[in-house]
Amino acid sequence: MSVRSLPAALRACARLQPHDPAFTFMDYEQDWDGVAITLTWSQLYRRTLNVAQELSRCGSTGDRVVISAPQGLEYVVAFLGALQAGRIAVPLSVPQGGVTDERSDSVLSDSSPVAILTTSSAVDDVVQHVARRPGESPPSIIEVDLLDLDAPNGYTFKEDEYPSTAYLQYTSGSTRTPAGVVMSHQNVRVNFEQLMSGYFADTDGIPPPNSALVSWLPFYHDMGLVIGICAPILGGYPAVLTSPVSFLQRPARWMHLMASDFHAFSAAPNFAFELAARRTTDDDMAGRDLGNILTILSGSERVQAATIKRFADRFARFNLQERVIRPSYGLAEATVYVATSKPGQPPETVDFDTESLSAGHAKPCAGGGATSLISYMLPRSPIVRIVDSDTCIECPDGTVGEIWVHGDNVANGYWQKPDESERTFGGKIVTPSPGTPEGPWLRTGDSGFVTDGKMFIIGRIKDLLIVYGRNHSPDDIEATIQEITRGRCAAISVPGDRSTEKLVAIIELKKRGDSDQDAMARLGAIKREVTSALSSSHGLSVADLVLVAPGSIPITTSGKVRRGACVEQYRQDQFARLDA
């Protein structure tokens, strides 16, 4: 479907397949086994028009409209209604206190919305939050579910009057204050085409008939928004959705939604694969068949090869093919998708010498002292290069540098942040190689390298730990720890003696044991096992292992560890140690 904008794509779907299912939301709050609520394409379009008509009374073209509602069909309708009205949508979660409120405050201040779209179940929280913001002109608050959404509507908005910007995707803020990535309709459309080309490279970018997208990811997160709302509309595919809470309550629900007659395309971060493998029982899967699954992409956080293997092994008896699991790399500044693994085969893992990798050189090896990394295809579109971030010169094969991205999926910048936009989106390569544009390049802030025509990702440059003069990826250290503890952990470096940095690991555990003595003995055994594993796998001695209860490590709204906050809490001795 060749269209210029999301509203145009929705209009085309409503015209071409009006009575086909568009979005189905599985509500597990009404019933433990789920209640399916479905909108057809014509119903969705009509509801979108009614929201747009209501918004026509608020502000003008290009003004911002925040969507702050629970996960559900009302959120989908609200987001699309904002676009239909020619407003710039701002996806957000419902304020609930703590980090969520800090994020909401930051987004509301930065975007200055003329309206907030919510629901009657969440309006009290939204009103209360907005009321705490004195001195600002309050936005109109609209309860979407109280509108007459199914009323006949002749609302129109000319295609050429839509602003080029579709929505602001605020970053998770794991290393800084959230910034609004300015996403255009073109960015979203192009990235959808790139995504389809990457995942369906062997079928000319076209999935088989009877395909559907399955997602529980939050709509305010880039992967949840694109996979859950934008991709179904741009492709004209049905979507089956539920909430993150429903998944966390019972991970088997995700597996159930994918074990359907249709060909499921789904996505989740690494932790979800771990959770599903550990907490889904054989009884949960009785009578289920995963053989129709098309693709499950793993992205949004570092993909751990051991987790993928556990997930594949766990569900193999239910006909899951390991080749459908596709490790993927992307970021909000590039809409969502940049690269994925090779199609038609299980994810490939390559071992590299840890010592050499710490020094910036990729040296394949076998045996101990290795860091296992997953390989990704170098995409044709967008263009990806590995660049020395200091000299802006392309790195030779096997040399670690910063991942730079160029293409029409890359945003123009951050909302009202010209200096930061120039630093991040205005990269220029010095003496580019043949076929390589000089610029502009998105500087991703991620380190990686290319060897044998494959790309490997190490992690966030800002998160790199420098211990005794060597660079270490916290993701690698955390993966080693999680193989033992299975819970969330954070590897950080803090100042030590003589101007050196020392390694500290914060580890979430449940304090188990028949007695306090048994529990303490178990904690001691875990500390010894972790210490030994870090020494043998990474050549590192850990200065302090801080064992804490689940939920103690500060995270972003998308579940990423806030390492800066961890460092501050550690320095202030604010972690409640289980073995104190």
From Swiss-Prot:
What positions are marked as the site Important for substrate selectivity?
Answer: I227, G330
Which keywords accompany this UniProt record? ATP-binding, Fatty acid metabolism, Ligase, Lipid metabolism, Nucleotide-binding
Summarizing the annotation, the consequence of altering G330W is: No activity with lauric acid (C12 fatty acid) as substrate. Instead, it catalyzes activation of acetic acid (C2 fatty acid) as acetyl-AMP
Q: Which residues cross the membrane?
A: none
Gene Ontology CC terms = cytosol; plasma membrane
Give the observed phenotype of the deletion mutant.
Disruption of fadD28 abolishes the production of phthiocerol dimycocerosate (DIM) on the cell envelope. Grows normally in liquid culture, traffics into host (human and mouse) acidified compartments early after phagocytosis, suggesting it no longer arrests phagosome maturation as well as wild-type, impaired growth in mouse macrophages.
Activity control summary: Inhibited by acylsulfamoyl (acyl-AMS) analogs.
Instruction: Report the superkingdom from the record.
Output: Bacteria
| An example Gene Ontology biological process | symbiont-mediated suppression of host innate immune response
Q: Describe which pathway this protein belongs to, using the record's wording.
A: Lipid metabolism; fatty acid biosynthesis
SUPFAM superfamilies named among the record's database cross-references: Acetyl-CoA synthetase-like
Q: Give the EC number(s) listed in the UniProt record.
A: 6.2.1.49
Q: Name one GO molecular function term.
A: ligase activity
From the UniProt record, list the reaction(s) this protein catalyses: holo-[mycocerosate synthase] + a long-chain fatty acid + ATP = a long-chain fatty acyl-[mycocerosate synthase] + AMP + diphosphate; a long-chain fatty acid + ATP + H(+) = a long-chain fatty acyl-AMP + diphosphate; holo-[mycocerosate synthase] + a long-chain fatty acyl-AMP = a long-chain fatty acyl-[mycocerosate synthase] + AMP + H(+); dodecanoate + ATP + H(+) = dodecanoyl-AMP + diphosphate
Gene3D superfamilies in the record, alphabetically?
Answer: 3.30.300.30, N-terminal domain of ligase-like
Family recorded in the similarity comment = Belongs to the ATP-dependent AMP-binding enzyme family.
The name of this protein is Long-chain-fatty-acid--AMP ligase FadD28
